[in-house]
Curated annotation (Swiss-Prot):
The lineage of its organism: Bacteria, Bacillati, Chloroflexota, Chloroflexia, Chloroflexales. InterPro entries: RNase_HII, RNase_HII/HIII, RNase_HII/HIII_dom, RNaseH-like_sf, RNaseH_sf. This is Ribonuclease HII. Belongs to the RNase HII family. It comes from Chloroflexus aggregans (strain MD-66 / DSM 9485). One of its GO terms (cellular component) is cytoplasm. The keyword Transit peptide does not apply.
Length: 212
């Protein structure tokens, strides 16, 4: 199933005029920030949805396909906002509050006001805008799928920058997710400033270091 505009069309029929899709990337990583994006699609997309046929849930696309989709979203979005919460704040707040903070920052950085939000499996307390929380929203709503692309590509680029600072961890390869390569690097070099020290196995490693 590919994302489409059926949910957006339902909201428009209820009288909402400007809709933003919101999604995040990096929630389950051992290292790096949580990045969220908010996307308002341009009116032409509602007239010609095929313009974004290349846009899908970011997890279903290759890196090359995501870059192509990213370019299309940039071209056919009325507004894009991005919010980034670094690893040390993920540790300080916890992953759920950090994710909501990133989403809120993305919403607040939009260049236009919105009437309703479509959010992938989440709600934003304190935001006085009608919200639709959609399970697997990035596979159902084109607005959320577009946000997932922006969030994922933005975060991947940040992790490529981190890789240039700390090449021994392989951030450019795994983007901070838990892989055997990442685990071996953690054991060999210990955590970097980009690592989330409250996440396993980073916490396990720190506990072992403290007890030795």
């Amino acid at each position: 199933m590919s994302p489409d505009l059926s949910i957006e069309q339902t909201l428009l029929a209820r009288g909402y005029r400007v809709l933003a899709g919101i999604d995040e990337a990096g929630r389950g990583c051992w290292a790096g920030p949580v990045v969220a994006a908010a996307v308002v699609l341009a009116p032409i997309v509602y007239e010609r949805p095929g313009l974004l046929d290349a846009v899908d849930d970011s997890k279903q696309l290759t890196a090359v396909a995501r870059e192509r989709a990213y370019t299309l979203v940039q071209r056919y979005a009325r507004g894009i906002g991005v919010g980034t919460v670094p690893a040390f704040l993920v540790d300080a707040y916890g992953i759920l509050p950090a994710t909501r903070l990133a989403m809120t920052l993305a919403l607040l950085s939009l260049p236009c006001s919105v009437d309703a939000l479509l959010i992938d499996a989440e709600r934003l307390p304190g935001i006085r805008v009608p919200q639709e929380s959609l399970v697997r929203g990035d596979a159902r709503s084109l607005s959320i799928a577009a946000a997932s692309i922006i969030a994922k590509v933005t975060r991947d680029r940040l992790m490529q920058t981190a890789d240039r600072c700390y090449p021994q961890y392989g951030f450019a390869l795994h983007k901070g997710y838990g892989t055997p390569v990442h685990r071996r690097a953690l054991r060999q070099y210990g955590p970097s400033p980009f690592h989330r020290r409250t996440f396993q196995p980073v916490l396990e490693l720190l506990d072992l270091t403290d007890s030795s």
